[in-house]
Amino acid sequence: MVDHEGEDSSPTDGFGHIPVLLHRADELLGPALTVNDPQGGGAVMIDATLGLGGHSEHFLRTYPQLRLIALDRDPHALEIAGGRLAPFADRITFVHTRYDGIEDALDQAGLPAQESVHGILFDLGVSSMQLDESDRGFAYSIDAPLDMRMDPTTGITAAEVLNTYSHGDLARILSTYGEERFAGKIASEIVRQRAKEPFTTSAALVELLYRSIPAATRRTGGHPAKRTFQALRVEVNGELDSLRAAVPAALDALTVGGRVVFMSYQSLEDRVVKQEITPRSKSKSPEGLPVELPGMGPEFRILTRGAERASEQEVEENPRSAPVRLRAAERIARRSAA
């Protein structure tokens, strides 16, 4: 969730962030939120990745009768967003959970886990707030403790991964989660270095990565630390496992006519989203039949042509939106009893 917060009428707000693809998200979710009332009366929306609350604030202002369920695993984000969204507190249920906690969040809000929600938004990945907080260890441009936990109250740190994982496991996560070509070489260097001195801060890791990646690749492949930091963050936070559970839970939660928007920032996330929504947007009837068999039709229709990208203008105003891939779907039929 590269959390680009901001007012919908200006590039940035007092928080200094811009919500990514804000107007496109509204364009896609708005019809579902206003199906019964142009002010959002009777509609329930889930912001599965609240962050600093920029997207949520826009929807709460635009639809003054909308009910919002706001999820985030970062207690600090919930605290900041809670203050920001205080004027709308009577319409919000805040839940401290990962985005695969949708079912429990709905239970806390007194709603069933299936077909009770009209709109859901996922803005995946690390938030701008987390990148900008120097003590969190997410940014390779800042020397900081190697933590990388989105919820700093639980779980292992990036330093623990570096200092305790076997060579094979390190190479696996670097290759799988970071799509790093030099995963084996980097893993060997990590094991060699930690035998001399355990990793504690990001500067030592960045220095190692500069040594490990060939100069020719560094010149053309972006910052040498980018892929390794991504891989560590995904491993520390269990991001892909969480997403694999969250997408079907979100689809199940939508009522007929309800819509979901996913904004991914890396190919791994986008692949998970696509793999989950595509099968449920296809007929299950045998090919060649003149009519659709009862209960075998598609549950969803895809609202986007492939994965949409940010416009040149948006990227210019907000460089962190450059990698975004947006997909959206609408429930068109109830889930088959089968």
Curated annotation (Swiss-Prot):
Cellular component annotations (GO), alphabetically ordered: cytoplasm
GO-annotated molecular function: rRNA (cytosine-N4-)-methyltransferase activity
Q: Coiled coil where?
A: none
The alphabetical list of record keywords is: Cytoplasm, Methyltransferase, rRNA processing, S-adenosyl-L-methionine, Transferase
Leading EC class: transferase
Report the function annotation for this chain.
Specifically methylates the N4 position of cytidine in position 1402 (C1402) of 16S rRNA.
What is the protein's given name?
Ribosomal RNA small subunit methyltransferase H
